[in-house]
């Protein structure tokens, strides 16, 4: 479920205060027989009952105030989330003012509790869902959040956002069915996840978007904008420098501040983001006390760059947080829209040429392990040979998948020394020859055309280029021409939108309950959809069938089996060269902040969502800038 996963990656906390049904107000006649609930669970019961006070992992008495300064990478020229990923570069932090109907708890899997919505109802067959808005939900201009706002937002995203449009394509209509009620109708029954997906809809103010700006120009929800948008959330945009920095400030009269979804969260008075184009510069900014928090993605930096005076004096705290909320595939991903990558033997040959074990020793200080699944680190990852329900599912596509799916456990080639690399390159060359290539004058050429095999790795940061440069000599030993092209964030986004690349570094985060987002990742329908996450260009009937099997599962065991089957077929088609994972979030912070004693199991660091500014600590660690 991608939208929920995105909120988890942001560390967004969620909670709900729902009154007893007697206080919901008069129901419309059509809704009299509805069973209203305070939350949704994909499988099983909700942890938190109706009327709960706050989430277990927050401090309801957390001090309020203070400023936190964070890092963002790249640039931004847009605040309109409707066209994010299609036009311009969206600013970080839009979730601070854009609220959703429902929101997720960070200590549960695939549950939602109402935020803008106070209650939700759906029939047993999941063919529709109805949300009831809270009577006190307000925009920052004081106007109420209405069903018309929800319907406007749904239509805007469905018509203009390729990614969300793909999620909502099975929602046939949204209509007002009561003073505060909105009903969404689906194109068929049985899709248990659709009510939750609709609940993750960011709600926009219809009256603001259909109005005019300070210059009298009519606003356009289909275009980028740098006009600070009207929101309903706990923060508003106070100040910004395009492409450089953002300052969000807490809304004093925020309508939802006493909701138990909000209690203990969003405790800072200001949240600042400083943009950097280079991770090395960002690290130096952190060392210089220009930002408060840093997530470290470099193994080398983690091993060598944090022995500076503030760390030794315990003014900077280094801490790792377990990753339990997502599975991940990080990879060198092929664009199989290009003819040279259509043959899976070619793609597999690239994996034989990648010596992860040697790279791990030389570059990563031995910190990483190889990824062997598209759902790495979860119970959803396939292993061994298929059996039981997974085997039954795979048998439904047996004639459409590689035979190894049933006979051979997937594993990546092992390197780590020169003999192992020579053996792997020998296997790679055999695969190339089987695919119609040959060696001529030390060059790998197409046996029919004589054209040398050439490949370009497209990256957007120096760290990724470093990985490519390590990989490059092995490919060149096979007679391949290898180029690495590093471009800025805007160029990178534009080339991705146009599918203009050979190989990119790509990753897919996976929730613990996969569902409709798998269509956006791997389906034939998404392969030619601009803005989709099917960056590989997969058009595979077996995978399409398995995706639908994942979406329409009826219980957790069936979901796990169907996901393992999908994982196995993806792996044996060699769409990517899997990279590596650490399994933890590495973080560094200036010691001015505190957090609850009990951290949410699936919330990563949950910073800054459930943390707060600690004045006593800050007095001992005064800011240098």
Question: How does the language model describe each region?
Answer:
Residues 33-125, 155, 230:
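N-terminal lobe/hinge region of extracytoplasmic solute-binding protein
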Residues 132, 166-214, 232-241, 386-398:
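Surface-exposed binding/hinge segments that line
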Residues 58, 62, 85-92, 119-163, ...:
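Aromatic- and charge-enriched surface segment that lines or borders ligand/interaction sites
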Residues 173-176, 238-249, 274-338, 348-349, ...:
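Extracellular/periplasmic solute-recognition and catalytic clefts
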Residues 134, 223, 254-306, 348, ...:
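Ligand-site clamp/hinge motif
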Residues 114-121, 125, 140, 145, ...:
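Aromatic-rich, solvent-exposed beta-strand/loop patch
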Residues 92-110, 155, 199-265, 269-270, ...:
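Gly/Pro-rich hinge or "lid" segments in bacterial periplasmic/extracellular proteins
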Residues 8, 13-21, 72-74, 96, ...:
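Detector for C-terminal structural segments
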């Amino acid at each position: 479920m991608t939208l929920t996963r995105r909120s988890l990656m942001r560390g967004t906390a969620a909670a709900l205060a729902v009154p007893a049904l007697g206080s919901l107000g008069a129901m419309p006649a059509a809704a009299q027989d509805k069973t209203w609930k305070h939350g949704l669970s994909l499988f099983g019961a909700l942890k938190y009952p109706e009327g709960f006070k706050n989430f277990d992992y927050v401090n309801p008495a957390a001090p309020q105030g203070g400023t936190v300064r964070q890092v963002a990478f790249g640039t931004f020229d847009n605040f309109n989330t409707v066209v994010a990923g299609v036009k311009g570069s969206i600013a970080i932090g839009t979730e601070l003012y854009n609220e959703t109907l429902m929101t997720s708890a960070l200590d549960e899997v695939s549950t939602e509790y109402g935020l803008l919505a106070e209650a939700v109802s759906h029939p047993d067959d999941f063919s529709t869902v109805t949300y009831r808005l809270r009577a006190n939900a307000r925009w920052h201009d004081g106007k109420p959040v209405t069903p018309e706002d929800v319907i406007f937002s749904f239509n805007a995203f469905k018509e203009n956002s390729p990614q969300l449009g793909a999620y909502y394509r099975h929602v046939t209509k949204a209509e007002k069915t009561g003073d505060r009620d909105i009903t969404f109708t689906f194109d068929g029954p049985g899709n248990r996840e659709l009510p939750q997906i609709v609940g993750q809809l960011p709600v926009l103010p219809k009256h603001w978007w259909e109005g005019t700006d300070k210059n009298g120009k009519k606003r356009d929800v289909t275009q980028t904008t740098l006009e600070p948008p009207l929101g309903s959330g706990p923060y508003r945009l106070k100040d910004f420098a395009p492409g450089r920095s953002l300052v969000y400030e807490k809304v004093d009269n925020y309508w939802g501040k006493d909701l138990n979804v909000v209690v203990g969260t969003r405790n800072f008075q200001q949240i600042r983001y400083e943009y950097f184009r280079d991770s090395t510069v960002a690290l130096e900014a952190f060392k210089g006390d220009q930002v408060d928090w840093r997530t470290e993605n470099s193994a080398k930096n983690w091993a060598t760059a944090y022995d500076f005076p503030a760390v030794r004096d315990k003014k900077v705290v280094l801490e790792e947080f377990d990753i339990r909320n997502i599975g991940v595939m990080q990879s060198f991903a092929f664009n199989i829209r290009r003819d040279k990558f259509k043959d899976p033997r070619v793609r597999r040959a690239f994996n034989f040429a990648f010596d992860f074990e040697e790279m791990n020793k030389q570059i990563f200080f031995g910190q990483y392990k190889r990824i062997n699944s598209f759902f790495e680190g979860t119970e959803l990852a396939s292993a061994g040979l298929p059996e039981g329900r997974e085997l039954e599912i795979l048998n439904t596509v047996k004639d459409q998948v590689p035979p190894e799916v049933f006979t051979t456990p997937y594993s990546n080639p092992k390197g780590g020394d020169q003999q192992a690399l020579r053996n792997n390159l020998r296997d790679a060359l055999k695969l190339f020859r089987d695919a119609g290539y040959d060696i001529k004058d030390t060059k790998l050429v197409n046996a029919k055309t004589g054209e040398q095999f050439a490949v370009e790795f497209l990256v957007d940061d120096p760290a990724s280029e470093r990985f490519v440069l390590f990989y490059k000599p092995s490919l060149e030993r096979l007679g391949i021409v290898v180029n690495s092209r590093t471009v800025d964030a805007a160029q990178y986004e534009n080339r991705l939108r146009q599918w203009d690349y050979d190989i990119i570094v790509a990753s897919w985060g996976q929730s613990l309950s996969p569902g409709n987002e798998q269509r956006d990742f791997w389906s034939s329908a998404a392969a030619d959809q601009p803005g989709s996450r099917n960056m590989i260009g997969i058009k595979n009937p077996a995978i399409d069938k398995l995706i639908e099997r994942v979406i329409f599962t009826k219980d957790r065991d069936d979901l796990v089996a169907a996901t393992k089957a999908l994982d196995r077929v993806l792996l044996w088609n060699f769409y990517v060269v899997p990279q590596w994972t650490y399994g933890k979030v590495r973080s560094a912070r200036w010691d001015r902040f505190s957090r609850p004693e009990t951290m949410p199991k699936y919330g990563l660091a949950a910073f800054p969502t459930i943390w707060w500014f600690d004045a006593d600590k800050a007095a001992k660690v005064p800011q240098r800038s």
